[in-house]
Amino acid sequence: MNFDNTVHESNFDDLLHNPNFPPQFDQLELDSLLYGTDESQESTSSSSFGFSDQNAGFRSRDGGSLGDSSSDSSPPLSCANFTENDQEMWDFGFQSRSPFENFEQQFGSPYQDDEVIAEPTNEFMNARYLREEPAKHLPMQQKRIITILPKQSQPVKRIVSRPIQKVYRVKESPGSQQQTYRVVQPLMPSPSQATQRQIKQMYYNEPVQEIHMQPKSGPLVRQVSEEPRYVPIAPTVDIKAEPQVFTSEQNRKIRNRMYAQASRMRKKEADEHMKMNLQELLQENEILRTENAALKQRLAFFEHEEPVVEVPQPFGRNQKKKRIIAAGSVLMMFGLFAVISPFNVDNNLNINNQIMAISNETSMVARHGRVITYEDSAPVAKIPTQQPIHNYPNSTQNDCDMYKLNATETIRVNNDIERWVQVHSFDNVPMKFSGGLLNKEAMRKFNYAQKVKPASVYGPQTLAVQKKSEQAALRSRERTWKQLDLLKTGNNIQLDNEKIQRKRQDIDKIASIVRQKGDTLYIMTLQDYVLLPSLIKGANSVPKLSLLLPSVPMNGTLQDQYTLLRVDCEVTGTGQLTLSNKQLSYLMP
């Protein structure tokens, strides 16, 4: 407003205390002074002002309107008639809050948007200052009408569940499983119910009992809470659960925990075992202490007795008696030693140096420069059979008339076996005749080749050499054959006899399986064989074995005869071994 050409701010307090307040103030409408526009504000229910649609103004307690000079009940509000009561009501109108601020908290329902009817704007609605102009009769404009439509809220239900101190079992139909029920605490209320309870407690301090809405007509129905009072426990039967899959890291951790737990259990058991042993030893020690104390008491009791007095004997007689007892003891020990000793003294003293009997049928002449012939050989005598003084059944010394070979016979037997092994070895058999071990056809062809070529690798074999010239010629031929053997190289043999080399490797494998000894001959026969069992069997006698093997004839054989080599053996041990079919297939003809 412009008073006396001076612009003042729109401060209501300054206007009221201004002494130069214009007398035309009673003609102004309070709506424009209070709010600056023609819009009206809502009034609270606690205020003494009421909003009226007829005069669009405020009425006081006595019914008069504020700011309307047309009212007959009260004069218009001015500085002269603005009383103290009006001042208080005026201040209250500015201090009171809107009644719709806590609408949602009071009624528990969301606040709905107000229906506002907008009226056409005019040039006076946005004016901040009022000028003194002659009143113009403007057409009556409609004020904004605010209609509050509260949302109907459902009655709040409060369900209070009390815990029951009993456990019930409900027996269902025979086809269904039994379920065990247990008592649980009341479930937590829903968030909406908790909010409603908090809102009610904000405005009501005393407990409020729920009043259920009943129908106007019809029988009374009691509303029962649908909240479950019992929660079923899992059934007692096993439930098939899917196997849980763990990662490698989880499996490693589980294994580590298992191993650690097992280690702790073992340590605990070991500690308990040690404690038990310690307890037993302590008990045994206590028992021994008790017995020792008892023995000491008995010893002390006997020590108090008087000692027995012995009459001393002469010194010479006692010394002689001791010597006799010592000599008798020595003789007794010597006799026991002679009886129990495993050494046969008599047999060792009665050893005869004569050559033992050897069967002439199996004797052969070896290839040596100096060989004793059959005619010039000394007579061989048999050892007279006599029973020794000490005959031990467990000893193998005198069982079955065992013979002992002298140096000459030992050399002869070794040469015979070595010759047989060399003839039947893979290296000395010609490749065109080699068909496998113990192959009869191969042996027949080999014998025929030996007849055609009597001078073999080993030289000619004769019964006796009487003249020195013949002996010299024989030695020269042997040297010649040895030199020819030295000219052969191993490469040619390997190139020509690849199959034989493979068989040799297989035989080496078999020898490693058998654990071959250096001084033992091992013979494997894989074709038909004939067994001649022993006629006399003894449990304490050493078993003997005689092998009959095909051999090379010495001086030629007849058409219907075949030469065999007999090998007498003494069994020193037996054992079993396992060979594969592939290894045996190389040895089969």
UniProtKB/Swiss-Prot annotation:
Principal location class: nucleus
Organism encoding this protein: Caenorhabditis elegans
UniProt record, GO biological process: ATF6-mediated unfolded protein response; determination of adult lifespan; endoplasmic reticulum calcium ion homeostasis; endoplasmic reticulum unfolded protein response; positive regulation of transcription by RNA polymerase II; regulation of transcription by RNA polymerase II; response to topologically incorrect protein
Positions with biased composition (Basic and acidic residues): 1-16
Chain segments carrying region Leucine-zipper: 281-295
Stored PROSITE patterns: BZIP
InterPro entries associated with the record: ATF_bZIP_TF, bZIP, bZIP_sf
Entry keyword set: Coiled coil, DNA-binding, Membrane, Nucleus, Transcription, Transcription regulation, Transmembrane, Transmembrane helix
Cystines in this chain: none
Membrane-crossing segments per the record: 324-344
GO molecular function, one term: RNA polymerase II transcription regulatory region sequence-specific DNA binding
CC terms in the record's Gene Ontology section: endoplasmic reticulum; membrane; nucleus
The protein's name: Transcription factor atf-6 homolog
Coiled coil: 271-305
